[in-house]
């Protein structure tokens, strides 16, 4: 008949250290995030450059302060 338990001479398979396991899980999570971020995008670098350029422009607008008075004029003819 079959046995439900391994032979007593065999030792349990070694389990990975907790730190190693966490590192592998972190690597896998980062890889999945990168793949998800680039899904459906043909040229990833151009998208990243556009995003950085947009953030730079927004930062310049935020640091420039409020626009000076009289910037726009409304004329009715």
UniProtKB/Swiss-Prot annotation:
Q: Can you say what this protein is called?
A: Small VCP/p97-interacting protein
| Region: VCP/p97-interacting motif (VIM), residue numbers | 21-33
Subunit comment: Interacts (via VIM motif) with VCP/p97. Forms a complex with VCP/p97 and DERL1.
Q: Which residues carry this modification: Phosphoserine?
A: 46
**Which compartment or compartments is the protein found in?**
Membrane; Smooth endoplasmic reticulum membrane; Golgi apparatus membrane; Cell membrane
Cellular component terms (Gene Ontology): endoplasmic reticulum membrane; extracellular exosome; Golgi membrane; lysosomal membrane; membrane; plasma membrane; secretory granule membrane; smooth endoplasmic reticulum membrane
Q: Tell me the keywords, alphabetical order.
A: Cell membrane, Endoplasmic reticulum, Golgi apparatus, Lipoprotein, Lysosome, Membrane, Myristate, Palmitate, Phosphoprotein
Similarity comment: family membership: Belongs to the SVIP family.
- Region Disordered: list its residue ranges: 1-20, 25-77
Q: Where is the lipid attached (N-myristoyl glycine)?
A: 2
Single biological process term from Gene Ontology: negative regulation of ERAD pathway
Q: What does this protein do?
A: Negative regulator of the ER-associated degradation pathway (ERAD) of misfolded proteins. It competes with AMFR/gp78 for binding VCP/p97, and inhibits AMFR/gp78-VCP/p97 complex formation that is required for degradation of ERAD substrates. Involved in the regulation of adrenal cortisol and dehydroepiandrosterone (DHEA) biosynthesis.
Q: Where, if anywhere, are coiled coils annotated?
A: none
Record's superkingdom? Eukaryota
Question: Which coarse location class describes where this protein primarily resides?
Answer: membrane
Pfam families in the record, alphabetically?
Answer: SVIP (PF15811)
**Molecular function in Gene Ontology:** ATPase binding
Q: Spans of biased composition, class Basic and acidic residues?
A: 25-37
């Amino acid at each position: 008949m079959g046995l439900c338990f391994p032979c007593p001479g065999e030792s349990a398979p070694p389990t990975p250290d907790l730190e190693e396991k966490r590192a592998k899980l972190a690597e896998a999570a980062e890889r999945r995030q990168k793949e998800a971020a680039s899904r459906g995008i043909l040229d990833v670098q151009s998208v990243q450059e556009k995003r950085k350029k947009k953030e730079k422009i927004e930062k310049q607008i935020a640091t420039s302060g409020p626009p000076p008075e009289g910037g726009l004029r409304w004329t009715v003819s």
